[in-house]
């Protein structure tokens, strides 16, 4: 009797702990998203700031020698994100930021050496008016070209950035429509907004590229048919090889890890072989003949 009672009590406690853990995980996910994915409207009145700056890059702006600045916060939770510390930057960076005006002063000192600045994240368009104002000041006060990285979830901000004078946009295409939520790590992908941003870029108002980081097991060959249909006729499209930076989101964020496990199981993230990437590329070329691989050894 006592053995059965002990088993029942242990089982009950374990069940309650499991429920409590899942509840706290869900609450934590909601708190993280609320804190680090403020909308452009919610950021109104917050001064533009960056959470890091690379003073020289030969990779971030195609064909240009540039500086790269990193914005904080993101409305996606891609489990393979290589800048996971920026997703929760406002919590993890402890207030250590770089003021936008300081960045502009740096650029003015580097005129004649640097050719441009790449703005990445995180998701830069979450900064809305602050981002647009910063871009406008860079164009007015320096001779630098400006490149913007984005996931395309805020086409209204993208339009304003184009009007402010950006020179190049690199937009991530996470996956096919059916599996976008899996790769984005979030049920609310704002896919209608993503499609709107795709249309803006295809319209030719600014130079651009689309890109997809192929990650095993998140992507399949069929996904590249879907991606091709989304951006058919694009000027440039790159399939990028996944590389573990040591700062990927799934290893630092319980909510992202839980979402990835529920979506694709427990398989570890990894890179596809060159042959596998070539097969994806062949599919993409049916829709974008100029498609290329990037970052393949």
Residue ranges of predicted features:
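Glycine-rich, highly charged phosphate/nucleotide-binding loops
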Residues: 96-106
């Amino acid at each position: 009797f006592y053995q059965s009672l002990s088993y029942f009590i242990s089982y009950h406690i374990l069940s309650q702990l499991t429920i409590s853990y899942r509840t706290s995980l869900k609450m934590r996910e909601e708190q993280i998203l609320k804190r680090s994915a403020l909308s452009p409207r919610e950021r109104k009145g917050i001064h533009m700031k960056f959470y890091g700056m690379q003073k020289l890059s030969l990779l971030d702006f195609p064909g240009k020698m540039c500086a790269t600045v990193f914005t904080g916060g993101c409305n996606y939770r891609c489990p393979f994100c290589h800048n996971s510390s920026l997703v929760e930057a406002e919590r993890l960076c402890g207030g250590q930021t770089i003021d936008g005006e300081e960045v502009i002063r740096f650029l003015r000192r580097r005129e004649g050496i640097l050719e441009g600045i790449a703005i990445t994240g995180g998701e830069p368009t979450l900064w809305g008016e602050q981002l647009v104002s910063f871009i406008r000041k860079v164009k007015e006060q320096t001779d630098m070209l400006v490149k913007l990285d984005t996931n395309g979830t805020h086409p209204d901000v993208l339009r304003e950035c184009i009007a402010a004078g950006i020179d190049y946009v690199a937009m991530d295409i996470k996956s096919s429509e059916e599996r976008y939520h899996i790769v984005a790590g979030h049920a609310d992908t704002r896919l209608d907004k993503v499609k709107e941003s795709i249309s803006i870029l295809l319209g030719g108002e600014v130079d651009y590229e689309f890109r997809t980081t192929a990650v095993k097991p998140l992507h399949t060959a069929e996904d590249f048919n879907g991606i091709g249909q989304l951006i058919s006729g694009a000027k440039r499209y790159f399939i990028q090889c996944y590389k573990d930076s040591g700062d990927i989101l799934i290893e630092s964020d319980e909510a992202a890890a839980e979402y990835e496990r529920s979506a694709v199981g427990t398989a570890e993230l990894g890179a596809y072989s060159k042959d596998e990437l070539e097969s994806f590329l062949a599919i993409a070329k049916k829709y974008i003949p100029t498609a290329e691989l990037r970052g393949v050894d």
